[in-house]
Amino acid sequence: MKFFALFIHRPVATTLLTLAIALAGILGFRLLPVAPLPQVDFPVIMVSASLPGASPETMASSVATPLERSLGRIAGVSEMTSTSSLGSTRIIMVFDFDRDINGAARDVQAAINAAQSLLPTGMPSRPTYRKANPSDAPIMIMTLTSDLYSPAQLYDYASTQLAQKLSQINGVGDVTVGGSSLPAVRVALNPQALFNQGVSLDAVRQTISNANQRRPQGAVEDGQQRWQLRTNDALQTASEYQPLVVHYNNGAAVRLSDVATVQDSVQDVRNAGMSRGKPAVLLVIRKTADANVIETVDRIRAELPELHEIIPAAINLEVAQDRSPTIRASLEEVEQSLMIAVALVILVVFVFLRSGRATLIPAVAVPVSLIGTFAAMYLCGFSLNNLSLMALTIATGFVVDDAIVVLENIARHVEAGMKPMAAALKGVREVGFTVLSMSLSLIAVFLPLLMTGGLIGRFFAEFSITLSVAILISLFVSVTLTPMMCAYLLKPHAPRSQPQRRGVGRLLLAVQRGYARSLTVVLNHARWVLLLLLGTVALTVWLFISIPKTFLPEQDTGRLSGFISADQSISFQAMRGKLEDFMKIVGADPDVSSVVGFTGGMRTNMGLMFISLKPLSERKDTAQAVIARLRAKLANEPGANLYLNAVQDIRVGGREANASYQYSLLSDDLAALRTWEPKIRQAFTALPELADVNSDQQDKGSEMALTYDRASMARLGINVSEANALLNDAFGQRQISTIYQPLNQYKVVMEVDPRYTQDISALNQMFVINSEGKPIPLAWFAKWQPANAPLSVNHEGLSAASTISFNLPEGVSLSQASEAIERTMTALGVPSSVRGSFAGTAQAFQQSQSSQLWLMLAAIAAVYIVLGILYESYVHPLTILSTLPSAGVGALLALALFDTPFSLIALIGILLLIGIVKKNAIMMVDFALEAERNGNLSPRDAIFQACLLRFRPILMTTLAALFGALPLVLTSGDGAELRQPLGITIAGGLIMSQLLTLYTTPVVYLMMDKLRRKKRTQTINATQH
């Protein structure tokens, strides 16, 4: 063909074109960002609203529900959940993949504005939103500690200055400040003193509010000068509030200090953070959905010197945990695997061809194909991540195949005595169509993946496109650079004097002769081979159905998250003690590097810990082994449970949970949900396939239910509004005024002095001043009794919801756990009013299960169509595809042998095998058809000769692909758990297919030929009659 000759006869142009591809790839490599995995995060927006002192049920009905109704009208929302706790509501909105996060944010703001008129008037601020997923693991955690500054002052610096600067960094989605609260002036009232003076709590509130005002006063001017008016209307510190007059009693002033303790304190006293055994304020940084982890972390670290400058020297700002080191280490491991794979496949070529000059050709072609791929990756907006680098590692065995097929055929002609230039022209013409068929049919495997939407399509896109581009570049290089180098580098009659070369050559010749004898026997017993092939198909189906399955392999990222759940009626002080105890035990583990944690806020029975493990090279055990060890140590800790999870790079959904997987219960009947949730949770706990079973239903908190006697209230001259104001003033940490300062605003918080609220008898000291100015004790018009109350109320899609979370015990797959859950739900007879479904990662797994088989069938169909077009035949593609069952059996048996569940990574391996193993059949069928057409050979002689002639390149390409996957199988460093399933699948499939297809393909070829001839004969006979 003139196309091939053009490059062979113009070596300078071909060389420069190759250099251009390589240089473009090098430039692309330097510009590519780095990430752990392809960008598959769902767009998530978190809406927050607060109403201090409001119960969870009040927050759910008056705040969450109006917002949810308005937000639920936004297009592209795939999931909306909310959690309402004491004084706080948080709504998590997960959008479809194709929804632009900025456009979604504008719609969210519009929906908040539309719902504003339906929200309570007492809210201190409008609802706000953040473009971040609170369930995502932080990319960095900073701590502030000091021996000089109080936690409140540290929190002030963190929230006022540091969080503001960090939030401005590109890629930062949310900065959560925890461990304390903003400074505030706290007014702790003495109810007995108030009663003695005849002063109501609400009168104190109004006095303080009126005394602290920031209003414009205007200006005074005459004809020549203008004076701005300024008054001392604002109060800043506790000492300025103490002398305020709240009442006159018989002409004597009753000052605030007479009836209350006023001090500079914090806005919420129920917050605590710890780091290294000391009180600390934490800055928990999360990225936006579309941000790159490494780039964002690098930008944050670049800002650290400036951050240190804006805080006092006595404050110690440290990076306690950083997600990037393990990501970088994992990518270094993949890069090493890639280099090893390149070296191994070149070694295969050298062993078979026994020529340094011949080996030099693929030694150039392979790196050029791989390096050139980086340019396309940059243009496509991809990153250097575990999947894209794995694609290049596997591609090493593919791209060398094209070079091997061309090189081996040209070398065969040279060894037969032909001159290199003539051999190059003839050899590339003979196998040009073969190489094209091999490459295009391999790329066809990925077409269904590229058309698949959702998580799987996004997850596979980079891998598929990267591998396809590498194959296309390899195809171009193999028919241009490879024959040109053969024409000028190969020498006719190459010496064979070295004993090692003679030994390798004799060994290959002996193996080929043995194959010829065994093939003769097989062709004489074709029926048995066909039965074996059918048995292989049946075994493949059975193995695929029965093998344990999971979503993605469990990663060891060197990070653990710990959720502490205590009794729902526990006090904040007791919960803080639990946090300290757990952190001390976890921090003492030899494989733990650092632990930070905090508790408090609106859910005082919960604590959160972030645990960083030592680098994998410095610790004895994996993350799961560390979790198992800590779980055993903490099993007998009284009063609280610690749930530990290994942080994963991919987390589906926006739910914050105490375990890795979730099962969601929904109902429009809250009573039915609260009845059935404990039964379902107990049944799940008894399942051996589940571990760490827990629920987010918090309905066992203690409350004191007050019942108003409305008739008595009317007679006494008071109303419900005044009574509720009394309770809020006394026990709600009510924010009654705002202190304005240049950098921030702080609150004045009023409540009854905690010394008088140690037990429920404090209610007996509460009173309301009626319309006649008389103090009316609360007990005169209200009765109270203890009851259970929810600490939080959860919604999903406007329905009441409860989420049961669970982990997997060692040796149990997600498919086994899912089947156990479905059996249990059926056995329990749960009513239709309570709906159960998997959520988060478990839901994504269920969806992937339904699509995996269709993806494989679609890939096979795509390959068949491409081969049918190339061969202009309905029959020959079936011969080529008959190689697939043996590869499937080998892959699934290898996974079972290594005790590895079938995951999305293994699915990639299966799809790759569909493209790989058919190469052997293509080389056989091409040469057999050529021999039939031009050599006038019978079908049996043609396929027999094709098998022998192509035995060496088949063996070379198979071993090259096998050695390309071998580094992934043997890897043991960071990220090995992601790479091993791919390597195991490909290696197992290649070994089994190599053993079987050398015999099954010629048998199927002859069977198909008989069918084709029989049909042709029948057609001729029908025409004649």
Swiss-Prot record:
Chief subcellular location equals membrane
The source's domain of life comes to Bacteria
Keywords assigned by UniProt, alphabetized: Cell inner membrane, Cell membrane, Membrane, Transmembrane, Transmembrane helix, Transport
Under Gene Ontology molecular function, one entry of this record is:
xenobiotic transmembrane transporter activity
Cellular localisation: Cell inner membrane
Which membrane topology term applies here? Multi-pass membrane protein
Annotated TM spans = 16-36, 333-353, 360-380, 387-407, 431-451, 459-479, 528-548, 853-873, 875-895, 897-917, 953-973, 984-1004
UniProt keyword annotation of S-adenosyl-L-methionine present: no
The record's listing under SUPFAM superfamilies reads: Multidrug efflux transporter AcrB pore domain, PN1, PN2, PC1 and PC2 subdomains, Multidrug efflux transporter AcrB TolC docking domain, DN and DC subdomains, Multidrug efflux transporter AcrB transmembrane domain
One annotated Gene Ontology cellular component of this protein: plasma membrane
What InterPro entries does the database record attribute to this sequence? Answer: AcrB_DN_DC_subdom (IPR027463), Acrflvin-R (IPR001036), Multidrug-R_MdtC (IPR023931)
Its subunit composition reads: Part of a tripartite efflux system composed of MdtA, MdtB and MdtC. MdtC forms a heteromultimer with MdtB.
Q: Which family does it belong to?
A: Belongs to the resistance-nodulation-cell division (RND) (TC 2.A.6) family. MdtC subfamily.
For this entry, the protein name equals Multidrug resistance protein MdtC
Q: Which organism is it from?
A: Pantoea ananatis (strain AJ13355)
